């Protein structure tokens, strides 16, 4: 932990040194290393983003250009925009597309700085008459774990109207940490090499991810709607802390760390900012077809996760106390403010489908006894503490909605009362899932599609399991689960 403190001090020193460099740039000393992006499309406007890299420190100006054709033979809109080190030289503009071009048809955009021109991006808004939409779903894109081939492939298909990222857009771990064992071989060592803690750390890691060729290809192809999960902050985050943040303060104040992560996220993502920066939950309407509600199940209202090991006694596992605490009506995942907002939101539209874009699995899920499925006699050290809980029939993923059953029931009741058909989209697990969602009485309330990771390893790889045995067993013992795939990324 002393190493992390030293790194924080060195980062502060580096910032001070950079700030002392004289300002002023020649017109040719600009670069667009991080591509362009668009996001948060409404029926009349969309966010357009880029990052200008100057060779010297100081405020600078860039020009946004919009055209209805790719060669920009006719520019229908242009605007001078300012940026500086205060926003890490990122630029965002909320373009009122409806005034200049037809909704659904799309447009092209680019930026100029000096004599340098950025990549050309393509974006669009969705009119009230939209009847079809092709949407890509992504989650868990871990740079050192592998190439972002899924992004590249989606861009090359050239048929997406929109893509969603359900969280873990980037990871906080240092070199030598989670899923970095192949990083040097792949040429994907995380930057900085230490764990993200300061604003400088988060900015540098975001910059590295945005420089990836697959990422740049997809970002410029179609608008993005994104929400954060935990790794944009720190593993297993909740509203007042995180598993990967030391309680003794060796990693600094958690709230300061979270604020730094949020600031960098808003700077580097094509997302529309709200007055309360922590409030990322928001809604989008794609014609009368889809009412898309992006939730925050991670840090806005979430209570701390229950840890089964805390219910171990000398006489065994205290199931009575475990279930009493787990099922408490006071446990929140969304929080009352967000839940009330959802209720008002779903009652305000008559879209054919209500879709929740959110972070963690909503379906009820129990794990089989995997001790006999291990392909190696050596049990991973991190797995050993959990083996004693297998076979007890308790929920297995308490970081997901299974850890907050009362809150899940409250959400289900809202949807039942509003007579809404809904789809839950989830990320987080790195695996693919299809489940039918049921309320406490066993009545169907919706379906869930769990998205695989872009690169983070799946459960059978992490635990070294026999894939066929695991899939057959987990589907068999879970009533809601219809299908799962732990091995394919995408």
Segments and roles (model prediction):
Residues 3-9, 15-18, 26-490:
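Metal-dependent phosphoester/phosphodiester hydrolase catalytic core
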